[in-house]
Amino acid sequence: MAGLLFQGVVTAACVFPFSSDPHRLRLKRWWSKAMLDILGIRLDADLAHAVPGSMVVANHVSWLDIFVVNAALPSAFVSKEEVRHWPVMGWLAGINDTIFLKRGSRGHARLINAEIAAVLAQGKHVAVFPEGTTTDGTHVLHFHAALLQPALLAGRPVVPAAISYWEPDGERSLAPRYDGDISLGDCLKNILARIKELEHEGYEF
């Protein structure tokens, strides 16, 4: 996993700035699928019906959701401003077309909505998590409707997506949850620990 992360950082720094949009999207999809494979996550999604310039609207369970969406339909993301300052991950988000939103600032929200609408009008997909936070995946919180406004401004379609994680036996998996007091490190430990348990039970990844 560390090797793939390093490869992703190098690719983002050395290849992305010189790549065409289609090539960047292919790289994002490949890298996201590779990350999911390493973590033993099989993607079951069909967003092929999404026309260019669609807004993907999804619930939010985990930091893995970004890889899930990008593996299915490479998109720009709308994220809270704080993410920009995270070590490594913030830098990666910044060069991966992430649009950062300052919470609580109506003036900034209007500017961001115009920016998102412009991206959609260019035929690029934009993904948003309108709950504004994560849950354990067993329920959906109130949506912040203002995040959907750019699709209306640009006259672009909205593609709803329900994200959930499941065990091989069909039970809902809580290992990827990134809510409450769970840190990024704890979440990753939970996922890796669950992989080891499943391997011990005879599952192959």
Which residue stretches match the model-derived regions?
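Soluble, non-transmembrane catalytic domains of enzymes that act on hydrophobic metabolites at membranes
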Residues: 42-46, 66, 78, 84, ...
